[in-house]
């Protein structure tokens, strides 16, 4: 059975958590394959709003097995305090349906301090880190001296921990960074490490491949967005992991031949949190209105998101590098109040060239979006229950995007609740 992959096509915050929750009944397994507590997947259902950071978004479906894969970096404090303990109110049986890879990297308290020190040292060149210790943890992983979840089962775990933290303290001292409060976080860290030992810790590559061989339906849930990918994003303003479909293979331990559908999620407009290039960003009242209507504030940091019009060259690029098979358009309702919409179809470079491809360096200021004006629907969508009941202007907007990208839009979200999701045809999901 194939593994379907769901990932963001922009700079994150596209609405992946909601879509996973909507599509989850079609799957036996939901597996996260990269990122960590820097991601925030928001689910709204039955009057509840829940933000998941590390736990897969299928956790609210009792018949679904959820896996935190080897590609994640795990913050055990946040895992328990912000997720597991808060989920107790929903009476979920996490002992039955949540599994954690032994190969997932551990975020140590000293990693968080390193993140703060590195970001402060960059001065005006800050990349907008969430300061959750993600980058330093991935750095230790790549340099082959990080700690992994499986290490907590080893009798020499404390020796490994102390050795690594001593190295971190040398770096922190070099940066003259005050880490006097780290001890308090360490106490919490070890408290939750003891709880983590009692969780379902598995050799996830065998776990997921056994599920494939048993013909189970599997959805790989990405975090952040393709334009934040460490290799193909707007470098250096990127995250530290592979946010692409290829990351599902390395972050779960599955062969490329097992990849099935690739669902690419995008907002009907664009947003970005933190620093970095954003060609269609709006600095006017229109941008403020989009932020207001979309409640565009980071689910992890609370920072206001930068807002702008839809960027087709960037979207086309993300579809190409991921081999997207189906497009899912989110937050169409945010644009309800606009009589006209702008869509970026090309970029004008500083030398006058007009292109529809992403330049090597998007961080230069000589890139101007070229827009096409489309008619807005300028009406409320709350009474729309099917694709056919959507206003013609929204259907035209959708059709224009489909024609430009050469891919079908099979889902349109018209509100935050799981019920406010219109699916053209469920047959596109693996049966």
Curated annotation (Swiss-Prot):
UniProt pathway annotation: Purine metabolism; AMP biosynthesis via de novo pathway; AMP from IMP: step 1/2
Cofactor section: Mg(2+)
Cited function: Plays an important role in the de novo pathway of purine nucleotide biosynthesis. Catalyzes the first committed step in the biosynthesis of AMP from IMP.
Catalytic activity, reaction form: IMP + L-aspartate + GTP = N(6)-(1,2-dicarboxyethyl)-AMP + GDP + phosphate + 2 H(+)
Chief place of localization: cytoplasm
Sites where the protein binds Mg(2+): 13, 40
Protein name (database record): Adenylosuccinate synthetase
Quaternary assembly: Homodimer.
Location in or out of the cell: Cytoplasm
Chain segments annotated as coiled-coil in the UniProt record: none
Annotated active site: 13, 41
Domain of life (superkingdom): Bacteria
Tagged with keyword Ligase: yes
Enzyme class: ligase
Positions of substrate binding: 299-305
One Gene Ontology term from the biological process aspect of the record: IMP metabolic process
Pfam families reported in the protein's UniProt record: Adenylsucc_synt
Family membership noted in the UniProt record: Belongs to the adenylosuccinate synthetase family.
Binding of IMP, residues: 13-16, 38-41, 130, 144, 224, 239, 303
MF annotations from Gene Ontology: adenylosuccinate synthase activity; GTP binding; magnesium ion binding
